[in-house]
Amino acid sequence: MKLSDAKRDFYRKKAKKQGYISRAAYKLIQLNQKYKILNNGDIVVDFGSAPGGWIQVASDYVGSSGFVLGVDQREIKYDNKNVKSLISDIYDPEIHNTITNYLPKKADIILSDISQNISGIWDLDHFKQIDLTKRIISFFPHIMRNRGTAILKVFTGVEVDKLISRLKIGFKKVEIVKPHASRSKSSELYLVCLNYNSKVIEYLKMIEVEETK
């Protein structure tokens, strides 16, 4: 068995044994072990939630006083008292308003493990993933609180550095991480974005409006 296959099999078996919906749960667990971003009482929005591995982990960490909203076009299989599911397309022009209506207040944490169907064409998959991520970033001024945190999945490629530069305008720190639970051969990376500055974003939006007049 190849090393990457062995790792995938290990986490699949571990997920089944420990009662997690998917092996992807361990990616978020490992990210949280490093950054301690999920805490009791937090409000979380998780994009690309199906089947529910990340929601399950987030739900455990935020507890009964927290809230987790999962957003996906597919059915989300996990349910709990502190979890709601929104079956929707992120390109729906009204989705940020819909999400806002679901949330008790602006989110502390935004998670994105979303991806489209993989074509196997490296550049094509990379650019599609960047577009998805940019779409989610566009929601931040509407749904994320000041000093919030985001974790965003991207695929390696030429646009990653540009995206990080853009994110650093609104976040104090942006780091690239590949959790051990990710397959060795996978091109996926996670951008961990810490300490969101909503005032900077609002200022930039104002400047953009002025420039278009």
Task: Give residue spans per PLM region.
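S-adenosyl-L-methionine
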Residues: 71-119
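Glycine-rich helix-loop-beta junction characteristic of Rossmann-like nucleotide cofactor-binding loops
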Residues: 33-39, 103-104, 142-143
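Conserved SAM-binding loop of SAM-dependent methyltransferases across substrates and taxa
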Residues: 51-64
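Conserved class I S-adenosyl-L-methionine
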Residues: 40-50
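Class I S-adenosyl-L-methionine
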Residues: 154, 158-213
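Short glycine-dipeptide loop
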Residues: 64-65, 144-149
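Class I SAM-dependent methyltransferase Rossmann-like catalytic core
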Residues: 1-40
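A short glycine-rich, Lys/Arg-flanked "PGG" loop and its adjoining helix->strand segment in the class I
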Residues: 130-146
